[in-house]
Amino acid sequence: MTDKIRTVQGKVVSDKMDKSFVVAIERTVKHPLYGKFIRRTTKLHVHDENNEAKLGDVVEIKECRPVSKTKSHTLVRVVEKAVA
């Protein structure tokens, strides 16, 4: 298989778990009737083996095989550190 692995960027909204965190991915969708663009947010649980990502960081994640019941993404890199 030569499918491209899907990577997305998002902001870390929770890092209270060990070796994992929650990232919020924001997208805009057009309202079907009125045409106004609306912001929609998707929250994903991400596996972080070395606990690199912290609250507020912008991170790049990729899809992988399921690590647990809710985690099916892994951390690729921290794009931007949060200002503390």
UniProtKB/Swiss-Prot annotation:
Gene Ontology CC terms: cytosolic small ribosomal subunit
Gene Ontology terms for molecular function: rRNA binding; structural constituent of ribosome
Pfam family, one: Ribosomal_S17
SUPFAM superfamilies per UniProt: Nucleic acid-binding proteins
CDD domains recorded: Ribosomal_uS17 (cd00364)
Protein role: One of the primary rRNA binding proteins, it binds specifically to the 5'-end of 16S ribosomal RNA.
Assembly and oligomerization: Part of the 30S ribosomal subunit.
Name of this chain's protein: Small ribosomal subunit protein uS17
Organism annotation: Actinobacillus pleuropneumoniae serotype 5b (strain L20)
Gene behind this protein: rpsQ
